[in-house]
């Protein structure tokens, strides 16, 4: 359970922003969304493999030399 302590004279918006940041760091919302519906093991493997391929090509694209313009 994520908790934050609201400081004296702290605006609500600032406290809410801090709470959202801590929730994002823990990864609780992403896990909750993933567990909302059952996902078959084959579908999970397929999704994870596609994500790995996407990360690989993204990394390669960052290492490529720029094209020469002439």
Curated annotation (Swiss-Prot):
What keywords is this UniProt entry annotated with?
Ribonucleoprotein, Ribosomal protein
The entry's protein name is: Small ribosomal subunit protein bS21B
- Key word Ribonucleoprotein present: yes
The major lineage groups are: Bacteria, Pseudomonadati, Pseudomonadota, Betaproteobacteria, Burkholderiales
Q: Does the keyword Ribosomal protein apply?
A: yes
Q: Which Gene3D superfamilies match?
A: Ribosomal protein S8
- Which InterPro entries does this UniProt record tie to the protein? Ribosomal_bS21 (IPR001911), Ribosomal_bS21_sf (IPR038380)
GO BP terms: translation
The record's disulfide annotation reads none
Pfam families, per the entry? Ribosomal_S21
| GO MF annotations, alphabetized | structural constituent of ribosome
Q: Give the protein family.
A: Belongs to the bacterial ribosomal protein bS21 family.
Q: PANTHER family recorded for this chain?
A: MITOCHONDRIAL 28S RIBOSOMAL PROTEIN S21, SMALL RIBOSOMAL SUBUNIT PROTEIN BS21
Q: Name one GO cellular component term.
A: ribosome
